């Protein structure tokens, strides 16, 4: 290229046609920048030196959302090693209920209620069936996320294996009930109400915590050996009872309001 020359490169995976000229590509670039600037303007950011970092974090969280369903994925990548040239290379392109709850809290705090509301209904959709709540789902609510090794790929800087899918999808992790109850409680407080069809879903999660809190599980570390007793899992079972109790009081469900605090106290004493 000589000074003053212009070129463009377009990588596209979209229903929309890619740009066919530099002018077209540049106009789309400008439009995209304006779109995200306008999106950030909807937020409520504190005025201090770290604001730009908060804005960048908000953009990252938004970039990890799947707009057709509201799912929030843990990462956009698979098989990047936890340590250089290591073997702990997992596929994180899925929506973990626990991790998404943290994202939900962050979005609410920064004023992005729309995105948080979308994830709320995604959680409701995956939890409303008769099956037990899983720890994670695909972006469209897929439940079966079987893990597969791609032997023909060498991996990032030679780190292998390269995996797609995640074998932890069917693990028992007892923090999941507290995570979903906490996210629904946060949503209910921000909305001053809860859709009527949601309450039976939440009661089922509380009852699951009551039934299983004494049992061993795989924990937030997703251990692939024998189940163990993790304090963090017991704490989140207590959270399920505590948030369930608070929601029950908001709904003036006096019977549950009398029962659940007693069980929460039992879990608290055990911890």
Protein language model regions, located:
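Acidic, mature catalytic/reactive cores of soluble proteins
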Residues: 1-271
């Amino acid at each position: 290229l000589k000074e003053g020359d212009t070129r463009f490169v377009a990588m596209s995976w979209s229903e929309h046609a890619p740009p066919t000229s530099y002018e077209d590509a540049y106009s789309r670039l400008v439009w995209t920048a304006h779109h995200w600037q306008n999106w950030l303007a909807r937020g409520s950011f504190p005025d201090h030196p770290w604001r730009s970092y908060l804005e960048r974090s908000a953009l990252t969280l938004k970039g990890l959302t799947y707009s057709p369903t509201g799912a929030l994925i843990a990462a956009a990548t698979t098989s990047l090693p936890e340590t250089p040239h290591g073997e702990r290379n997992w596929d994180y392109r899925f929506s973990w209920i626990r991790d998404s709850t943290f994202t939900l809290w962050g979005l609410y705090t920064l004023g992005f209620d729309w995105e948080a509301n979308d994830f709320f209904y995604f959680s409701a959709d995956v939890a409303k069936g008769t099956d037990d709540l899983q720890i994670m789902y695909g972006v469209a609510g897929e439940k079966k996320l079987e893990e597969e090794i791609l032997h023909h790929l060498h991996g990032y800087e030679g780190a292998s294996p390269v995996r797609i899918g995640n074998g932890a999808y069917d693990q028992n992790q007892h923090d999941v009930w507290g995570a979903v109850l906490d996210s629904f409680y946060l949503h209910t407080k921000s909305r001053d109400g809860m859709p009527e069809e949601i309450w039976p879903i939440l009661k089922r999660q509380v009852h699951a915590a009551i039934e299983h809190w004494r049992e061993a599980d795989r924990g937030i570390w997703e251990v692939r050996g024998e189940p163990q007793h993790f304090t963090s899992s017991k704490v989140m079972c207590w959270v399920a009872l505590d948030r369930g109790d608070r929601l029950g009081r908001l709904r003036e469900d006096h019977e549950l309001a009398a029962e659940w605090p007693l069980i929460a106290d039992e879990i608290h004493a055990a911890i």
